Amino acid sequence: PKSRNNEITQFVKSGLNDLSISRTSFKWGIEVPNNSKHIVYVWLDALTNYISALNFPNTNDNLYKNFWPADVHIIGKDILRFHSVYWPAFLMAAKLPLPLKIYGHGWILSDDKKMSKSIGNILDPIEVINKYGIDQLRYYLVKEVSLGNDGNVSMDNLKNCINNDLANNFGNLCQRVFSFIERNCKGKLPLSSKSEQVDLILTDNLLNKVDELIDDMNKQDLNNYIKKVVEFSFNANKYFNDLEPWALKKTNVERMNTILYTIVTQIKNISI
């Protein structure tokens, strides 16, 4: 984000000094060739893993050709300098391509404070996943924490997010629609006949924003992206409630079928 870009720009403009890529103050690590008294600087060692994992120095390897340069490095703000200054310097010295983008994310806070064992405010992600599910946790973090900034999390907010967005909103919509089709259409999605304006408004509202959604994703604005998707789901619920397909079963089956086809199409689009 702009704030991180400004931070690194100012650091570079202030003047860069030579960086030693070896240390003599400890023994553990990778020895410098031809000088066992020196150990390779840990950040040179660690950052190189991005390409050594792709079988570098074999630049003809499919892994390397497919995944380097990286489209984006997503890294914590506390190690931004190592990725945005040192890592590009290492790559440029080796005449290797740079990652296309580096995105520095903020910290996840607990009760507005940095998580700390001494304070006792750590949320164990494994415990949370076992209790609520990994996709539910991912959804909550994406929706409630703006990627470029610090974000506060709490178990109460997590539960409210899961209940309000996933269970009561999208989950409830899917359950109602698919159970209705199971009971009244022998479990098969009926074909649509003639769509009315209200049907087109629902589906076009999402389709017309696809470019916006792609732009949000390219900018790593996942927070804004997911809020738009949640709005699509709320609108789909309203559509289903307002048009009451259950009231049309005996009076206008053709219209009922169109409503069902439209709402299932929208559920599919939201899921994608």
Regions found by a protein language model. Give the residues of each.
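Conserved, non-catalytic sequence blocks in retroelement Pol enzymes and Pol-derived host proteins
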Residues: 197
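Residue-identity detector for threonine
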Residues: 9, 24, 48, 59, ...
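Short helix-capping and inter-helix turn/linker motifs at the boundaries of alpha-helical repeat units
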Residues: 116, 201-205
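Structured secondary-structure scaffolds
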Residues: 1-183, 225-229
